Amino acid sequence: MASYDLVERLNDTFRQIELELQTLQQALSSCRLLAARVFELPAVSKDAEHDPLANIPVVQHSGKAALALALRHYSHLFIQQQSENRSSKAAVRLPGAICLQVTAAEQQDLQARIQHINALKATFEKIVTVDSGLPPTARFEWVHRHLPGLITLSAYRTLTPLIDPSTIRFGWANKHVIKNLTRDQVLMMLEKSLQSPRAVPPWTREQWQSKLEREYQDIAALPQRARLKIKRPVKVQPIARVWYASEQKQVQYACPSPLIALISGSQGVSVPDIGELLNYDADNVQYRYKPEAQSLRLLIPRLHLWLASE
């Protein structure tokens, strides 16, 4: 059970995040808006929160309307702020960018504010995921007991400032989470599951135990040096590619929230060129670079566990 002091830290840190976000919103609102473009994505219903996304239609907003949506999005932290039918597990995303004219002093101040908010968010995430000492399955209940309706991913999600960018382009990224494992590491994982027998619908406890035993035997039969990897697909993500002319470099950013471009004019940039985000269509994905696929054989589908050929 998490201690009273930890609960106090959880609540205090979250209150600080809320307060700092409100102050940041006021500071951003007082700056001159140069340009803004955000891309509204369709809400994910509770019934479809685990479904793969084959198509994502995008609705574009620009100017003051885009700025208002962006400022509201930064503080969208609770499910009470959205429709009852909307999934509380699927991330609320609003890719895009707001570009604000600032003095050198304002740029420095806003950077410091954003950095402080991101540090608070990192502290909050650490309290939940590390300091609580709770397994992932118990964290949700613990957090929502003290902060009912919190969208934890939105609370963790950091803000991204851009300093005098020249161009901002948007796109979609298809990714996999890949983790290389040894045979013995996988056997240890399965052994832990075998030592904690339980029912996993639609299987009874006995059926699930039998399934685990078969999986264990299949992995134990592999050579000790077998190359195993967990390769799990991640839902398609909006990204931004930002070009900095003064440094002659391009940087790619994850873009679940509007980027905050602060334009001081010191790098010769007036208004950055902001591109658009096209609708996502899984059947027409164009890869900039697609390496030759490694030969893999699926061993345990539920774990996304694959065996790589030698």
Curated annotation (Swiss-Prot):
Cellular localisation: Cytoplasm
GO molecular function, one term: DNA binding
Family annotation (SUPFAM superfamilies): Replication terminator protein (Tus)
Name assigned to this protein: DNA replication terminus site-binding protein
General function of this protein: Trans-acting protein required for termination of DNA replication. Binds to DNA replication terminator sequences (terA to terF) to prevent the passage of replication forks. The termination efficiency will be affected by the affinity of this protein for the terminator sequence.
InterPro entries in the record: DNA_replication_term_site-bd, Tus_dom1, Tus_sf
Species in which this protein is naturally found: Klebsiella pneumoniae (strain 342)
Entry's family note: Belongs to the Tus family.
Pfam families in the cross-refs: Ter
Keyword annotations: Cytoplasm, DNA replication, DNA-binding
Highest taxon, organism lineage: Bacteria
GO cellular component terms listed in the entry, alphabetical order: cytoplasm
A GO BP entry: DNA replication termination
Main localization of the protein described in the UniProt heading: cytoplasm
